[in-house]
Amino acid sequence: MPRTWSKILIGIIIAIVIIFLIGFLILAFSEYFPEDRESIQIEGESTKTLKIGETASIITYNLGYLSLDNTQDFFMDGGKGVRPENATTVTKNLAAVKNFIQTQDVDIYLFQEVDTKAKRSYNINEYNGIKEDFSGTSSFAYMFNSLYIPYPVFNTVGHVESGVATLNKFDVKEATRIALPSAYSWPKRAVMYKNCLLEQRIAIDGSEKELVLYNVHLDAYGAEEGKTEQLDVLMNLMKEEYQKGNYVIAGGDFNQTFPGVDQEKFPIIDTDNYVPVQIPDNYLPDGWKYAVDYERPTARLLNEEYSGTYENTQLYIIDGYILSPNVECESVETIENNFSYSDHHPVKLSIKLI
């Protein structure tokens, strides 16, 4: 009898090892390896002309794959949730965001965390949904293209295809996915975001210069050095384009607190979970500027369902813009919506090329 139990135990151990090895091999051979620069398809037709001296409007909005609304928490932020209980949450939020796009009617939308096919959002193609009724062009760049994310162990994230999307009414001459350095080492790197910039080169009426626009989603959970390196890559690109005589804007979810945020108004009250690093005070060169609404939060911690009030909620200002000296900020405003469709608020910017 003892020998029988020993054989059973050995068999169980061997089976576990085999399963582990299979999983290891799947991670190794299915990891997404994008090129440093990849040409991105531009869908649709432009409907407006960008002109120097005229106002243009932009909104950046991290959609939280339309699954992280104010009824949700998230396991990587100290909560327990992996996905909503059913697809209704996703379809409801998608309908709301489509309506938001139509009612705001701005020239450019910079969206982050847009799923095209993922277990966490019930395989709903959110990119197709948000671009469906938009009068202009659209481009999409992958940040997640993972066959299977094997955690949490008993309720895995599973398959994820997701990225950033830019909707643009102006004439986009070229769109490019630019890879950013990873903030992770293997094997975690295999199942985490492959952060990138979605660059668009926009024609300007009567000028050989271009507006170079970056849709930004920097790392949230990796090492501080990796986050700093990603920001440095972005800024070096922006400075190079400005030196060529172009106009340059970067907008999105920086996952870093902007200089000038009032730490008394938006304090860190939860040090056990996600805490964004701060961009150094003197980071920008002379003449460059942030376009940030310092009065309203752009994101919340997903350690629990939103209480409905800012009191006792961990809030951040991590979404906004960086502008080159030849781009004038006319106004910038965070549009508060009670985190109804995402864990982020949209941020609206009005600019003028000067």
What is each model feature region?
Residues 80-86, 114-116, 181-189, 217-225:
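Surface-exposed cleft-lining segments at the edges of enzyme active sites
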Residues 3-11, 26-46, 238-249, 255-354:
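Metal-dependent phosphoester-hydrolase catalytic domains
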Residues 2-132, 136, 140-155, 161:
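N-terminal, active-site-proximal structural segment of metallo-dependent hydrolase catalytic domains
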Residues 132-134, 159-175, 312-328, 352:
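Conserved beta strand-loop-helix elements of the APE1-like EEP
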Residues 65-66, 115-118, 144-147, 172-173, ...:
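Solvent-exposed loop/turn segments at secondary-structure junctions
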Residues 138-146, 175-181, 331-335:
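Conserved S-adenosyl-L-methionine
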Residues 36, 146-211, 215:
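A well-ordered secondary-structure block
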Residues 57-63, 93-123, 167, 200, ...:
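Active-site beta-strand/loop signature of hydrolases that rely on acidic residues for catalysis
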